[in-house]
């Protein structure tokens, strides 16, 4: 599963890009 996170991805996840949600930039992590 993939998630949008702030401020960064959890250990073991990879960042594949960004998400824009609620006016903020989130890391897109899988």
Swiss-Prot record:
Give compartment(s). Secreted
* A Gene Ontology BP annotation from the UniProt entry: defense response to fungus
The protein's organism comes out as: Papio hamadryas
Q: Which top-level group of life is the source organism from? A: Eukaryota
Q: Does the keyword Transcription apply?
A: no
Protein's recorded name? Alpha-defensin PhD-4
- Give one Pfam family: Defensin_1
Which Gene Ontology CC terms are recorded? extracellular region
Q: Can the keyword Transmembrane helix be found in this entry's annotation? A: no
Note the SS bond partners. 2-30, 4-19, 9-29
InterPro entries with a match to the protein in the record: Alpha-defensin_C (IPR006081), Beta/alpha-defensin_C (IPR006080)
